[in-house]
């Protein structure tokens, strides 16, 4: 089914991992997807994108560059959806995190998300469909994790931002939701876990395996489709039951 035929949108962090998979899932459903990343191309050698995925090189923390990019896409094609997926982390005990590292995580994971939402706002408001924003949060917005406190802080902020924008922009015909990934094979997850921690995580989860990145794409596709018309201000965990596990 081509549920997203006729829709155009932007996804950040689209060169690899969850963003790359989501961009392709959306494109396969008929959308034209502008996948923004620092490299402007698929990260893994030999990896190809759907023909509807257009890779663009840009730095989400460069507001001038992102302003020019959104203006060009918005004027030429319109913007029906935005997926804020780009994110970074640093692995360090909280007391050892430098001011520069803390500020960089918040700059990329929070400030740039808010800025891109506001840059896309006039085009989302004009969309013939209800405009859609999907922010990628994390289990870390709901749980505490050692050695990644700046990341946890940033994702909690994005969750609150999602709810605030959903309330404020509902009158403008824009739905704002978020998706909280659990454990997926990605460059970021490899940075924060060794093999011992990986096995402990898998043993604890109700579904004892990491997710397929396309699982995130499927949830994002639903949230930018017409099937989610009455859903806004919500956070959807795609995590193999990780957030549901009790002691």
Where are these regions (language model features)?
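Conserved glycine-rich cofactor-binding loop
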Residues: 8, 15-16
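Active-site helix of classical SDR
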Residues: 117, 154, 162
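Alpha-helical segment proximal to the catalytic Tyr-Lys
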Residues: 122, 167-171, 229
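Residue(s) in the substrate-gating loop at a strand-loop-helix junction
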Residues: 138
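Short, small/polar-rich loop/turn modules that mediate ligand/substrate recognition or access, typified
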Residues: 83, 170, 175, 231-233
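Substrate-binding pocket helix/loop in short-chain dehydrogenase/reductase
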Residues: 93-94, 98-106, 189, 201
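Short C-terminal tail/terminal secondary-structure segment
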Residues: 143, 221, 232-247
